[in-house]
Amino acid sequence: MQIFVKTLTGKTITLEVEGSDNIENVKAKIQDKEGIPPDQQRLIFAGKQLEDGRTLSDYNIQKESTLHLVLRLRGGMQIFVKTLTGKTITLEVEGSDNIENVKAKIQDKEGIPPDQQRLIFAGKQLEDGRTLSDYNIQKESTLHLVLRLRGGMQIFVKTLTGKTITLEVEGSDNIENVKAKIQDKEGIPPDQQRLIFAGKQLEDGRTLSDYNIQKESTLHLVLRLRGGMQIFVKTLTGKTITLEVEGSDNIENVKAKIQDKEGIPPDQQRLIFAGKQLEDGRTLSDYNIQKESTLHLVLRLRGGMQIFVKTLTGKTITLEVEGSDNIENVKAKIQDKEGIPPDQQRLIFAGKQLEDGRTLSDYNIQKESTLHLVLRLRGGL
């Protein structure tokens, strides 16, 4: 099969290989084509560095896959630099490089002036005149880059979702400026932001110094929606999602918002509030869901299905079931929804009364089938 190898210069090399070729063979083929010794080649696929003894098949490399070739300098090594935003920069260095050289390489890659860089390794700040070897920094070590602003400081802003944003500020910045910086980073308009520090809401016209906010302080960001409100959605894994909603939003809209945040298709979502499953066509206000209410999200597995139960009053109940559920289970679900004890329920499908011990599949009840519920009164026959 053919695979492609892309170099850092943007050149693409085409190789003829077998899935059973090991990475060493592939490096030999690259040497034949490009003259680069195997010991200077690092091959990357799907973000992983490939090991010489493993085969292409081991890494699920198939025809027309693209590998990335990074050169490893003789006597040189690669190190990683991790920023507070979580971005990782890869640098080619020598053990004899001093910290000043390393900062210059970071400036070349990221445009950050050396005098604004603080490099940390093993909990120590690195001094410009010392070398990587002085600090025992070896290949594939990770340094941490913290920005030092002239006269400035870093503060943290924590959102209700648990995300932490890092901001570069001055003590003289007013709260309005801080909200503008948050808008730059996160796209949240200032008029929807409420900032809290030490339990107090911060006023736009005051400065950070007025509130004694110092370097590495943490502010809390709460969103204020125009006419809207925040609600929480708790999943079975214990994760809590924060949503911005209006009381007039219907449940379908809410499921769409959850899909945007979490990628879960609406038809796999069941939302529960105050013990009731919420129906798509109804609104949050219909269920008296108010600001900071918590809904519970239960996933409906693709193996499951919905069926309908129609009462003599004409009301239709929607149930989440499996084909393997027995009729007793179904009656228990109806009791959960409607409060009708199972011993007062008679369920009819296709003209037949359904028996407790049998399953939905036994009666060929499929998705979106409609059962009829007839009440059997106590003392009745």
Swiss-Prot record:
InterPro entries: Ubiquitin-like_dom, Ubiquitin-like_domsf, Ubiquitin_CS, Ubiquitin_dom, Ubiquitin_ubiquitin-like. Residues 1-76, 77-152, 153-228, 229-304, 305-380 form the Ubiquitin-like domain. GO terms for molecular function: protein tag activity; ubiquitin protein ligase binding. One of its GO terms (cellular component) is cytoplasm. PANTHER family: UBIQUITIN. Ubiquitin is synthesized as a polyubiquitin precursor with exact head to tail repeats. Some ubiquitin genes contain a single copy of ubiquitin fused to a ribosomal protein. In D.discoideum there are 9 genes: ubqA: 5 copies of Ub and a final Asn; ubqB: 1 copy of Ub and ribosomal protein eL40; ubqC: 1 copy of Ub and ribosomal protein eS31; ubqD: 3 copies of Ub and a final Leu; ubqF: 7 copies of Ub and a final Asn; ubqG: 5 copies of Ub and a final Leu; ubqH: 5 copies of Ub and a final Asn; ubqI: 4 copies of Ub and a final Asn; ubqJ: 4 copies of Ub and a final Asn. Belongs to the ubiquitin family. This is Polyubiquitin-G. It comes from Dictyostelium discoideum. The gene is ubqG.
